[in-house]
Regions:
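N-terminal, polar/Ser/Thr-rich
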Residues: 1-256
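Surface-exposed beta-strand/loop patches in extracellular or lumenal glycoproteins
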Residues: 260-275
C-alpha cells in the first residue's frame, strides 16, 4: 500500500477555516480542496492541498528567531501558501478532515493534484526524511510515529519550504528549505557520470543528481515542556553494547566490517526500530 500511494480525487474534501496544530506551528487552511492519497492501513496519510492557507510559527527563543530572520527577513513565520503536500500521522487530525464535506474533483484540478503528489513522491526530501518508514511505523501502531507531520509548502513569498515534526528526531521540529544545485546541462551530465561510477564501486548508494544542493535550516528545536524546558526526541531504543569485527582486504585496503549492536527498549509498545 505504501509503495502504491496515489491521489484519490474522488474522495477530496472541501476545507475552509480549518486549523491543524502540528508541534508549535499552526497550519490554517482558509479555503480550498484537500485531496487525500489512497489509504494505508485503512486511512489516508498523504494529502494535496490547493487553495488559500497560511502557516504560523513563533520560534522558542532569540537564537532560533535570529536564524529564521536570516533566511526569511522576519523573526516570526506568517507565510501564506496556495499549494502544499502534507504527511499527517495524527489520527485526530485525519478524523477531523474526514468529517469535512466531500468535494470530488476531476479535470484540471485532478491533474494538478496528481502532478503535485507524484513530484513529492519522487523528490529527494521524502527520501531524506524517511517518510515511508514513518508511514509504516504509524500503520503498525508504533507510538513514536503517531505524531509525525510533514508539510511541503509553496509559499507566496518564500518559495518551496518544508516544516517537519518528527518525534523520533533529537530536535523534533525542523523548518527549512532545500536549495538545489544550479547545474548546467554539462555539469549535470558530469555529476551523473561521477555518481554512477561511484555506485558501481559500492559508494554513494541511493544518491541522485536531484539530491545535490544545500539544506538551509531556518528553525531547528525540540519540544518545549510546560515549564519551557526542552524535551528531546527518542527512537525508542538505546544501545547497550557494540561488537565490531573489521578487516582491511586486498591491495586497495578496502574496509570490511560486521557490527552487532545490543539494544535496550525504552518506549512501551514499540513496534519498529529505526537505528
Amino acid at each position: 500500500e505504501i509503495r502504491r500511494i496515489a491521489p484519490d480525487p474522488t474522495s477530496a474534501f472541501d476545507v475552509s477555516d480549518f486549523t491543524l496544530r502540528a508541534g508549535p506551528a499552526r497550519v490554517v487552511l482558509s479555503d480550498g480542496i484537500l485531496v487525500p492519497s489512497t489509504p494505508v492501513a485503512g486511512r489516508p496519510v498523504e494529502f494535496v492541498f490547493m487553495g488559500m492557507g497560511r502557516i504560523e510559527l513563533d520560534p522558542p527563543d532569540g537564537i532560533e528567531a535570529g536564524q529564521l530572520e536570516l533566511f526569511t527577513g522576519s523573526t516570526r513565520l506568517r507565510q501564506p501558501f496556495r499549494r502544499a503536500v502534507f504527511v499527517i500521522a495524527l489520527d485526530t487530525a485525519v478524523d477531523a478532515i474526514a468529517r469535512r464535506p466531500t468535494r470530488p474533483v476531476d479535470g484540471a484540478a485532478a491533474d494538478d493534484a496528481e502532478a503535485m503528489l507524484e513530484a513529492w513522491l519522487a523528490g529527494p526530501e521524502r527520501r531524506w526524511l524517511d517518510v515511508e518508514a514513518r508511514i509504516f511505523a504509524d500503520a503498525v501502531g508504533d507510538p513514536l510515529a503517531a505524531g509525525f507531520f510533514c508539510g511541503s509548502f509553496e509559499g507566496t513569498d518564500l518559495g518551496r519550504f518544508l516544516y517537519v515534526v518528527d518525534p523520533m528526531a533529537h530536535e523534533q521540529v525542523t523548518l527549512g528549505q532545500f536549495v538545489r544545485a544550479d547545474l548546467s546541462k554539462r555539469d549535470e551530465r558530469r555529476a551523473r557520470r561521477t555518481i554512477e561510477k561511484a555506485q558501481r564501486e559500492g559508494k554513494l548508494i541511493g544518491l541522485e543528481v536531484a539530491d545535490l544542493g544545500t539544506w538551509d535550516t531556518w528553525v531547528s528545536t525540540s519540544f518545549q515542556s510546560d515549564d519551557a524546558r526542552s524535551t528531546s526526541g527518542s527512537r525508542g531504543v538505546e544501545p547497550d553494547h557494540y561488537e565490531i569485527d573489521a578487516a582491511l582486504r586486498g591491495r586497495d585496503l578496502e574496509l570490511e566490517a560486521t557490527v552487532r549492536v545490543s539494544l535496550r527498549v525504552v518506549v512501551d509498545r514499540l513496534r519498529t526500530v529505526d537505528f
